[in-house]
């Protein structure tokens, strides 16, 4: 378990890892008895970004379930290498935590797993909110060489991208934009 940290004034996370039927997941669940709002973060984020995305959720009325999607922070990429596997991982996380249903709030690259979760597990979803989400399908081009495939489809590649973003954000952003 990572140390609790305050992300914004009044918003803290206490991330921990749970083993699900689909693999390990880093998550944070706020206290309370209310309905659950599950947050699927975008690219370059994790459990921390997910929690900040849910800052507007009434903490007295709802519980916020934030997670790191596969390949981000404490969740290994092997826990969900496809959109469908990530959707099933969301269901497995609910199972492991003993939760029946959740509203899903997604942002950016967190959209496709959220959409797939709602399609594959409709009985587990009581609401779906998409904030500036990716809504198309982006597949690895057939022309992508082994280095590009290794960077975008392995834990080591994801760690290297993260390190590049930390060490040289100027180069990282130049490649994206």
Describe the residue ranges of each PLM region.
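Active-site acidic short loop of glycosyltransferases
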Residues: 32-34, 95-101, 122
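Conserved alpha/beta-hydrolase catalytic His-Asp/Glu region
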Residues: 166-177
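Flexible "cap/lid" loop of the alpha/beta hydrolase fold
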Residues: 128-168
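Short glycine-enriched, charge-decorated loop/helix-capping segments at active-site entrances
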Residues: 77-82
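Conserved hydrolase catalytic core segment
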Residues: 100-144
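Conserved HGGG/HGGXW glycine-rich cap/lid loop of the alpha/beta-hydrolase fold
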Residues: 23-76
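N-terminal cap/lid segment of alpha/beta-hydrolase-fold proteins
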Residues: 3-29
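Conserved acidic catalytic loop of the alpha/beta-hydrolase fold
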Residues: 85-103
């Amino acid at each position: 378990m990572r140390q609790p940290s305050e992300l914004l004034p009044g918003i803290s996370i206490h991330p921990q890892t749970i083993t699900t039927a689909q693999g390990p997941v880093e998550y944070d669940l706020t206290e309370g008895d209310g309905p659950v709002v599950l947050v699927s973060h975008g690219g370059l984020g994790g459990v921390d970004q997910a929690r900040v995305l849910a800052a507007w959720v009434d903490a007295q009325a709802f519980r916020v379930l934030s997670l790191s999607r596969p390949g981000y922070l404490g969740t290994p990429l092997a826990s969900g290498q496809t959109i469908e596997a990530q959707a099933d991982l969301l269901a497995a996380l609910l199972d492991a935590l003993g939760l029946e249903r959740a509203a899903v709030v997604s942002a950016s690259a967190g959209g496709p797993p959220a959409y797939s979760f709602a399609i594959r597990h409709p009985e587990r979803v009581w609401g779906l909110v998409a904030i500036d989400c990716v809504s198309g399908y982006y597949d690895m081009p057939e022309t992508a060489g082994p280095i590009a495939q290794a960077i975008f489809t392995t834990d080591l590649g994801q760690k290297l991208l993260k390190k590049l973003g930390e060490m040289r954000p100027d180069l990282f952003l130049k490649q994206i934009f």
